[in-house]
Design a protein with these regions (language model features):
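Short active-site neighborhood of thiol/selenol oxidoreductases, capturing the structured segment around
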Residues: 20-33
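Non-catalytic, surface beta->alpha helical segment in thiol-disulfide oxidoreductase systems
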Residues: 44, 77-112
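Short amphipathic alpha-helix with an adjacent loop that forms part of the alpha/beta core around
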Residues: 72-74
Length: 112
C-alpha cells in the first residue's frame, strides 16, 4: 500500500524543496492527540491524499512536543496543524485541526 513519504527533518526538507522547487507541507502533531491520530490514520491513508501530497509537496511530519522551536517559529497554537510553504520558506496556508480526506484535498487545492 502506498503511503505519504514523510520527512522528519525541517532543515533537510527545506533544502530538498529549494532544489526541486516544490512546496513544503508541514504537519505538526502530538502523541496522544485524538485528532492527530484521526488525521494520520484516516486522512493520510486515503489514496487521493497520498497521491496529491507526494506529487505536489515535500511532506514533513513533526511531533510538536519534540520540535518546540518549529512550533514557536510558526506560532502554532494547537495540534494537529498543517502548514504549506513555498520552496523559499514563505507560508502560503495553514489549516488547523482534523479534516476528512475530501476536505483535506480541498484545503490542498486552495494552495494553488
Amino acid at each position: 500500500m502506498a503511503e505519504i513519504n514523510w520527512r522528519d527533518n525541517w532543515d533537510s526538507a527545506q533544502e530538498e524543496a529549494q532544489k526541486e522547487n516544490r512546496r513544503i507541507l508541514l504537519e505538526l502533531y502530538m502523541d496522544g492527540c485524538p485528532h492527530c491520530t484521526h488525521l494520520h490514520t484516516e486522512t493520510h491513508t486515503d489514496p487521493g491524499v497520498i497521491q496529491a501530497v507526494n506529487s505536489k509537496f515535500i511532506p514533513v511530519r513533526l511531533d510538536g512536543r519534540k520540535n518546540m522551536d518549529i512550533v514557536k517559529k510558526f506560532n502554532v497554537t494547537g495540534a494537529p496543524t498543517t502548514l504549506v510553504f513555498e520552496a523559499d520558506g514563505k507560508e502560503v496556508q495553514r489549516f488547523p485541526g482534523y479534516y476528512p480526506p475530501a476536505d483535506y484535498l480541498k484545503q490542498l487545492e486552495k494552495t494553488g
